[in-house]
């Protein structure tokens, strides 16, 4: 079958490779070439680079509507979109005969939007997955085609979870391609209850989850506050921001305020207690394993790895010792 691929960043490359393996990719659509790297040299995106190496036709319009005629001329049976980066209007969605399927890194309707992996971790979810859905005019609101689910381990952060979901999504895309080849087109509404007939003649009502949203990460999302963040919330925010921009805290050392990036944090072991009377933002202990224990809103949390402004990653203990910080000092705000 003939297909069009819509995608831009590195995470989308494996999906183009899969689509090209099983279908005839007649057109690849990406975001325009942008300045990248230290020299800010105009460079094609990863999907475009890969597509050109494959010998595929690539278009990179500023606006998708600029290539409407090319999309129609391609004569595609369906499209696949992965992190394309532009909203597709209904008249564009309708061009491929069957429509366009998007691969989204959450279990829709939960975490619709640009940053589903980050917000899934912010929320402390223990399960997530990848959803293939038919694009409509809404933001990730179209009917579900298929999905795959996976557990989230406490040790996982945005980096490791992205890696897992990219792989899982590849398996899902292979399923989608095969379903379409066999004519098994599925469209399940995201937010309407599903009624399934039972053997006794009754109807089983499946309650679908309410939609939640995952907007693009803003600067204010990265600033953590020991006075108002509990240990679980702090830990989950650090995990969710592991791909960058990283979590940051305000430090005040010798009268100087600065922002310190938190690269890794960990929860207090269940068999250990947090001193109840120490002020929030104070250093409780400096551990031999390189961590420091800090008092937060409702408990204590370990800070493992930090990145001071203009410097490389280091253990939190190295940072503390370098600034002659000792237990009891209040340095975080």
Swiss-Prot record:
Disulfide bonds: none
Any matching Pfam family: Formyl_trans_C
GO function terms (MF aspect): methionyl-tRNA formyltransferase activity
Keywords: Protein biosynthesis, Transferase
Xref: InterPro entries: Fmt (IPR005794), Formyl_trans_C (IPR005793), Formyl_transf_N (IPR002376), Formyl_transf_N_sf (IPR036477), Formyl_transferase-like_C_sf (IPR011034), Met-tRNA-FMT_C (IPR044135), Met-tRNA-FMT_N (IPR041711)
Catalytic activity: L-methionyl-tRNA(fMet) + (6R)-10-formyltetrahydrofolate = N-formyl-L-methionyl-tRNA(fMet) + (6S)-5,6,7,8-tetrahydrofolate + H(+)
UniProt-listed Enzyme Commission number(s): 2.1.2.9
SUPFAM superfamilies, alphabetized: FMT C-terminal domain-like, Formyltransferase
UniProt entry tagged with the keyword Transcription regulation: no
Source superkingdom: Bacteria
Cellular component annotations (GO), alphabetically ordered: cytosol
Chain residues that bind (6S)-5,6,7,8-tetrahydrofolate: 106-109
Similarity section: Belongs to the Fmt family.
Matches recorded under PANTHER family: METHIONYL-TRNA FORMYLTRANSFERASE (PTHR11138), METHIONYL-TRNA FORMYLTRANSFERASE, MITOCHONDRIAL (PTHR11138:SF5)
Protein's job: Attaches a formyl group to the free amino group of methionyl-tRNA(fMet). The formyl group appears to play a dual role in the initiator identity of N-formylmethionyl-tRNA by promoting its recognition by IF2 and preventing the misappropriation of this tRNA by the elongation apparatus.
Protein name per the record: Methionyl-tRNA formyltransferase
Gene: fmt
